[in-house]
A protein has these predicted regions:
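Non-catalytic C-terminal interaction segments of nucleic acid-processing enzymes
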Residues: 139-184
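Short catalytic/ligand-binding loop motif for oxyanion handling, primarily in non-cytosolic enzymes
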Residues: 37, 91-92, 128-132
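Acidic-basic catalytic patches of nuclease active cores, encompassing PD-(D/E)XK
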Residues: 5-59
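Surface-exposed cleft-lining segments at the edges of enzyme active sites
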Residues: 25-29, 87-94
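Nucleic-acid nuclease catalytic cores
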Residues: 110-138
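Active-site metal-binding core of divalent-cation-utilizing nuclease and nuclease-like domains
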Residues: 53-81
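Mg2+/Mn2+-dependent nuclease catalytic core
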Residues: 90-110
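Residue-level preference for long, well-ordered alpha-helices that form the structural scaffold
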Residues: 2-5, 9, 95-98
């Protein structure tokens, strides 16, 4: 089992988890924030299972520092990572107040527990104009030890190119989401 490799998990949380969540979105497995939590929970548990980390466990919405973060990862009973998720399915809509509420929650958890190494915030949205929060912007706003990754369903991060087959995907996504609404 060996020593826990925090840097490896940080890389997973910042890159691989983001890619996996995008795949689930694009494959019509994520339609709302709860679906996003469920997918992330599965992939995080699978990550620890593959790395034989019996002392690490994952919980959804536990009570922590008077709040309920979406996901908390514990190592030997101590909170080590906290994760928050936001999902905005409506095109060209982002609620920045809701984003900053979650960032505040992460910051409060990080401040309350010395054992917490990082807080991770994952955002899925669909917009023509990319929404980003750089590490330097986060630090200036007082958010240290917090990483933000975002998935724009319409445009690729970095290149800002429109995704191939976006219009077809969006049409199907809207159709399927409308069908699900009667069961919500």
């Amino acid at each position: 089992m060996g020593h826990f490799d925090f840097e490896r998990f940080n890389g997973f949380a910042r890159q691989s988890l983001d890619d996996l969540l995008f795949s689930d979105l694009w494959d019509y497995d994520i339609f709302n924030e709860r679906d996003m939590h469920s997918s992330a929970y599965f992939y995080i548990r699978d990550y620890f299972r593959k790395h034989e980390r019996d002392s690490a466990y994952v919980r959804c919405e536990p009570q922590l520092a008077g709040m309920r973060p979406d996901i908390v990862i514990y190592e030997r009973g101590r909170p080590t990572y906290v994760l928050e998720f936001k999902f905005f399915s409506k095109p060209d809509y982002i609620n920045e107040d809701a984003i900053y509420d979650d960032l505040d929650k992460l910051a409060d958890c990080v401040d309350a527990y010395d054992s917490i190494k990082w807080g991770f915030f994952h955002l899925i949205y669909d917009a023509e104009i990319p929404f980003t929060l750089s590490d330097s912007r986060l630090r200036r706003a007082g958010f240290s030890k917090i990483s933000v990754t975002s998935i724009n369903a319409r445009r690729k991060e970095g290149t800002d190119r429109r995704r191939n087959n976006y219009d077809e995907w969006r049409g199907e996504f809207d159709k399927m989401q409308e069908l699900h609404r009667k069961h919500a």
